[in-house]
Amino acid sequence: MEQFRKTMVPHFLTKLWILVDDAVLDHVIRWGKDGHSFQIVNEETFAREVLPKYFKHNKITSFIRQLNMYGSRKVFALQTEKTSQENKISIEFQHPLFKRGEACLLANIKRKVPTIKIEGASLYSDEFQKIVTEMQEFKDMQRKMDAKYTQMKQDYSNLYHEVTNLRKKYCAQQQLLTRVLHFILDLMSENHTVLKKRKRSLSFISEDSDSEWDHQYFRIPEDKKEAMEILKDGYELVEDKYKSLLDRVMPILKESKKLISSGDQPSGDDGEHPKVPVQDKPMNEESLTIQLDLTIPVLPEQITEESVEQEPKDISLELDLSSQDSILMKDKSDNLYNNIINRDKKDMHHTEGNLLELNSLLSRKALNYDSDHFSESLSLMKNEEEKSQLDLSGGKDNHMIQCMETPELFLLDEIPMCDFGENLQDYDRLLEDLKNPPNVISALCDHDYVTSNISTLQEDTIENSIPQLCMEANGESSVFPFLILNPVTNIF
């Protein structure tokens, strides 16, 4: 036993050596004749008595399997007549290092390792190594992807904050741009206004009336850039605070229209030409339309006039009809217009004769005017007549301001115009004849629109607007334009 302790011998070999070397158990297990092998004489007794005591089991097959694992082999002896009976029961095993008297050799006996598993491991070692390498690469790629994902999250967060700031700046810029555009559109879409000091008092108006007019104007909606029918469709679009102004202005226009219509029907003196008709149709709210061109940003020229005593030569001034917005101004007192209408009625019988003379003179000439030449000649005619009238009046307080129509700002659309022909006949003679009547200018002053039948072939009418302007003795005057709108056949 001391020999086994010095060397590392498996317990199975140690127990087997003790059993075989014990002489007491020779009837069960013993050495062979040459000492190079051992024999199990009685298998049943060995399995029943010895195995449970030393190996904790009683299976002879398990014992034989253990011997095979340590390299022991079963010995088959030659069968003879003498030995055949002895070997029927015994089993002999042999190992090169398991010999009688040589216990030191037991340390060299090793348990066999299954070679099949080792060969399988060697075959799959290369593939396993490849798999391990690939797994390592996958792990590296995963780490890199995680790093990229973290960086992308940081970049996304930064971009989100930048986009938020840009949206705030964009909203602020949009608001600023909207305010600027509204400001510009308000400036461009505002109607022309009349300054307070433009209006002066008339001589026949009571002293208690206020000569200064408020700064009133209409605000037309921006989306209505074309003609707007005020009383029919556009009246609903006007702001509430300006509707009262319209309600006061429209009755004045109606009364003035009736007055002028009744006084503008002179009869021919020689019977050659019929009376000059004035379009005297009943004016209703639906037929009265005003066309406003909001796209013209030019403001009306300010009327500046001096008294007759200061500058008598500058009395004739051209007033652009772009000041038609003054018809929309608030009337402070209805008595002002009533006094003007009463004054026109008193002077109507004086102007009838002068209009008849002018009509007969124009009828005798029977000229064919072109529309452009007629407007130019009419302007020259009025200037000459005003100068002659001022010379005859001897510096009276009353003076006239000439209002010329502009083709861009017609109050009515598609007013029928007369075709006065292409050839201008005896133009110098006409001017000389028109200078002789002394009261032609007074006839033109008391009418807003004068219609004359110039051509015998075409019985059309043309209207000329000349507002009446009067002055007081102190030099102050007040402008009250009367714009009478005659109904036409084609309205919008």
Curated annotation (Swiss-Prot):
GO biological process: cellular response to heat; positive regulation of transcription by RNA polymerase II
Role summary: DNA-binding protein that specifically binds heat shock promoter elements (HSE) and activates transcription of non-classical heat-shock genes such as PDZD2 and PROM2. Protects cells against heat shock and proteotoxic stress.
Keywords tagged on the record: Activator, Cytoplasm, DNA-binding, Nucleus, Stress response, Transcription, Transcription regulation
Membership in a protein family: Belongs to the HSF family.
DNA-binding stretch(es), residue numbering of this chain: 9-114
Name the UniProt record assigns to this protein: Heat shock factor protein 3
UniProt-annotated stretches for the region Disordered: 260-282
UniProt region (Required for nuclear translocation in heat-shocked cells), positions on chain: 1-33
Keyword Nucleus among UniProt keywords: yes
Record-linked InterPro entries: HSF_DNA-bd, WH-like_DNA-bd_sf, WH_DNA-bd_sf
Molecular function per GO: chromatin DNA binding; DNA-binding transcription factor activity; sequence-specific DNA binding
Keyword check for Transcription regulation: yes
Ranges that cross the membrane: none
Gene name of the record: Hsf3
GO cellular component, one term: cytoplasm
One Pfam family of this chain: HSF_DNA-bind
Species of provenance: Mus musculus (Mouse)
